[in-house]
A protein has these predicted regions:
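PLP-dependent amino-acid enzyme catalytic core
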Residues: 1-310
Length: 310
């Protein structure tokens, strides 16, 4: 039976798992690598899930009402998801972000009708968060969803992303890998999968140049969307079994490779997840095992970066 959808938000979630056969063959690995393609969400990334969840929760609590203004510090994808959901729901959106974010991301936000306030790149996400809080004080009837502290973020992954992976693999998942930005994905999916099978290994991925989880050190890096430079409240640090760090170069290399082996255009943080998936797949104990890597977004918002430069 064909279905007509009443809102773009009804199309969020239910993203496909792709068996990355060509990519795996290129690396000669004997594990099964499955890619969870989050760019199939309507605004192109995994963050559509949390944008919808945070807005719906705020509407339920009375924090958002007709005429409210959504203000959020974002490195891009959460802003794009919120801009889309805000447009569909009739809210004004103001987004603060470091000036280091790609031009495509800024233009996308404007295309959805959101207003952008750029902050000092050297201050990273902390600078964007401070600016959002300052704007919220000046703006009546405003609400900050606060993706780095909002429990609706990990909760939506526990409710949707985790079960989708479990059902698609019929419970045959040995490793789950996700990059850590807010930590909502690795937390929600990790908690769900471990509740079904405590032997599932959950791997957190962070930039080699900003190894906050593994070494307690923050630094500048080029893997947009992960490695916020601090440990977010939304991250359950006891859910993952291991942290893998990925270099800028490997994130770019594997992201580009995936486009050229699988014909699927994914972003820089997806490249980081794929690099970690190959690292796991090369281990002798991973032979014959199933590795699910969550690929957060599409590559078309990185055409101005080094991702696809030969």
């Amino acid at each position: 039976m064909a279905k007509i959808y009443e809102s773009i938000t009804e199309l969020i979630g239910g993203t496909p798992l792709l068996h990355a056969k060509n990519f795996s063959a290129k690396h000669g690995v004997e594990a099964t690598i499955l890619a969870k393609l989050e760019y199939f969400n309507p605004a192109g990334s995994v963050k559509d899930r949390i944008a919808q969840a945070m807005v719906e929760e705020a509407e339920k609590n009375g924090d958002l009402k007709p005429g409210s203004v959504i203000i959020e510090p974002t490195s891009g994808n959460t802003g794009i998801g919120l801009a889309s959901v805000a447009a569909a729901r009739g809210y004004r959106a103001i987004l603060t972000m470091p000036e280091t974010m790609s031009v495509e991301r800024r233009n996308l936000l404007k295309a959805y009708g959101a207003e952008i306030v750029l902050t000092d790149g050297a201050k990273g996400m902390k600078g964007a968060i401070e600016k959002a809080e300052e704007l919220a004080k000046e703006t009546p009837n405003s609400y900050i969803p606060s993706q780095f502290t909002n429990p609706a973020n990990p909760a939506v992954h526990k409710r949707t992303t985790g079960p989708e992976i479990w059902e698609a693999t019929e419970g045959k998942v040995d490793y789950f890998l996700a990059g850590v930005g807010t930590g909502g994905t690795v937390t929600g999916v990790g908690e769900y999968l471990k509740s079904k099978n405590p032997h599932v290994k959950v791997i957190a991925i962070e930039p080699e140049n900003s190894p906050v989880l593994s070494e307690g050190k923050a630094g500048p890096h080029k893997i947009q969307g992960i490695g916020a430079g601090f440990v977010p409240e939304t991250l359950n640090t006891s859910v993952y079994d291991e942290v893998i760090t990925v270099s800028n170069e490997d994130a770019f290399r594997y992201g580009k490779q995936f486009a050229r082996t699988e014909g699927a255009l994914v972003g820089i943080s997806s490249g980081a997840a794929l690099a970690a998936a190959v690292e796991i797949a090369r281990r002798p104990e991973a032979k014959g095992k199933t590795i699910v890597a969550l690929l957060p977004d599409t590559g078309d918002r990185y055409l101005s970066t080094d991702l696809f430069n030969d």
